[in-house]
Amino acid sequence: ADGAIERRLPLPADVADRIGGQGLEGVAVDGDGVWVALQRELADGPAGVVRLGRYTPAQDRWEWYGSPLERTAVAGDWIGISEIAASDGALLVLERDKLNGPDARVKRIYRVVFPDRPGASSGEGDLPVLTKTSARDLLPDLRATNGYVQEKIEGLAVAGNGRLYLVTDNDGVDDANGETQFFDLGPVGEALAG
């Protein structure tokens, strides 16, 4: 394929310096804006609130919003964002725990309506926290094949045909069965109706 990098866009230093061991887990484009999702909370940020960033290229401007994460009481577990997609005036946010098999508890798609208010201009200051609504619990889909429930649902896409697709990431590690699963959940409006 032909192509060339036209521009590299670093994250603002006051965000990038506080990401820790995780990083970006999703990028979505809607109209004139580019959305990014951090996988976990900033190192010194509010507990249980992950950052969603909106970059507007025409103004070379970043804005930051918070999205509340589900909670876990399981030792060694954490909740994070795996992916985002833009659809019908909202971000679809894929949130998951680190658990697999029969222990898996949180594998969900949430809907976060695009905000009509400005976000925080940096990693500092007041962070507007957006409201999320549950759009689909994915555990029934993962269990429907009567196989092993994968830890990492890592891909979410609304394709040009209007269908919603998911994919797992087996990471190729020793504590996973090596299986990758691909799901066609159907037309996005129907897939997220419940």
Regions found by a protein language model. Give the residues of each.
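Sequence/structural signature of beta-propeller domains
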Residues: 1-194
